[in-house]
Amino acid sequence: MSLSVVILAAGKGTRMRSSLPKVLHSVAEKPMVGHVIDSARQLGASNIYVVYGFGGDVLKATLTKDNTGDDLTFVEQVEQLGTGHAVDQASPFLTDDEDVLVLYGDVPLTKVSTLESLLAAKPTDGMALLTVHLANPMGYGRIVRQEISGKQQVVGIIEQKDANEEQLKINEANTGILLANGGDLKRWLSNLSSDNAQGEYYLTDIIAAAHGEGKVVATAHPETEIEVEGANNRVQLATLERAYQARIAEELMIAGASLRDPARIDVRGNLTTGTEVSIDINCIFEGEVSLADNVQIGANCIIKNSTIGANVEIKPNSIIEDTIIEADCSVGPFARLRPGSVMKQDSHVGNFVEMKKTTLGVGSKAGHLSYLGNAEIGTKVNIGAGTITCNYDGVNKSTTEIGDNAFIGSNSSLVAPVIIGNSATVGAGSVISKEVEDNDLALTRAKQRNIAGWQRPVKKS
């Protein structure tokens, strides 16, 4: 049976004190609702309906930009009249012969495995709820059960404000996440009433309707409470962030990575690691990052959308973005590799070296205090301290080519476009603006002049 997912995302989130819709606040640099959409897709949903209200234009623009595919449909809830009313806005799109899963845009940490257990729990002619047992269920709707045919069956959900003293003692709480047949769901939604303490159309009232028709209401449960917690303010959002990062850290360690302090790593995308990978404190990984075997990451590094080869050492305080680093390289400390950088095998970039759109050849080295932009550098090249590729003339950027085995002396400026030949040498302090042929020595600095007996000026008292 096909599956559609309805994601409720209409809440304003007043307690966030923000102009953004609540569901667009981020966990790991992704909107909360983005995590929910990812889960729906991993479940194989044919259609995903996002029910929006406040801030609809920015929500649609954000999700359209970040989510490709034709499985996403936006449905407006003009008036916020309760969860039942919100789901009902998607009813015209739902078919009778599909299953419909209801999720929440501000509950981003529900595991796909938990949702799969909910799908498996649903009877053919019934529905399924995700419930959780809480030590303090204050504010949650309570699951009401009765003994039927020797089993404690779900017969309804009572909201906190409508519960009596006995019902408030129930510690099995409703998460709001449920699964039902499309035809059944539409029928139950059409019969909802707002005759309750909130004056709203409760989605939870469909449970009693299902029981009244003799349908079995099955339940499934998350492994941990945090899976079904939402964020109504920034404190709760921070709690979700740390829980998410703790989950990722645990997965990395189980996969074989060593984390110096699991509480001090942030993964804001997808990080894959090989064996014997070591990550020191306060490192941030963004986008798609791959670390091969035996990679060592020092403290305070930021790595974004990059591939790091085997046996590479990234020393502390280095920033790497959209870069490919091949095996056996070393980087930093305090290096910056900007988009388009490539370090070939066994090359080295040292402290305070910046690269952009540059390839550093096999075995080549740039040890200190250099800027290498729009450069193609051959094998076994030595880049002296303070070398600058002058790649920008105020309008266009040009390329510097440095051949194999070249030696660039310290404090040199290479004015692009320029070619330095194989085994060529550039003397320290030179400004090179013309081609240097293979095996040539290029010098442009002024001849040294010594003045004997020179007296420095004396300050007047």
UniProtKB/Swiss-Prot annotation:
Positions of Mg(2+) binding: D106, N232
Binding, UDP-N-acetyl-alpha-D-glucosamine: 8-11, 22, 77, 82-83, 104-106, 141, 159, 174, 232, 338, 356, 371, 382
The enzyme's E.C. designation: 2.7.7.23, 2.3.1.157
Cofactor names: Mg(2+)
Record: residues binding acetyl-CoA: A385, N391, Y392, S410, A428, R445
Pathway assignment: Nucleotide-sugar biosynthesis; UDP-N-acetyl-alpha-D-glucosamine biosynthesis; N-acetyl-alpha-D-glucosamine 1-phosphate from alpha-D-glucosamine 6-phosphate (route II): step 2/2; Nucleotide-sugar biosynthesis; UDP-N-acetyl-alpha-D-glucosamine biosynthesis; UDP-N-acetyl-alpha-D-glucosamine from N-acetyl-alpha-D-glucosamine 1-phosphate: step 1/1; Bacterial outer membrane biogenesis; LPS lipid A biosynthesis
Chain positions covered by the region annotation Linker: 235-255
The protein's name in its UniProt record: Bifunctional protein GlmU
Source species of the chain: Colwellia psychrerythraea (strain 34H / ATCC BAA-681)
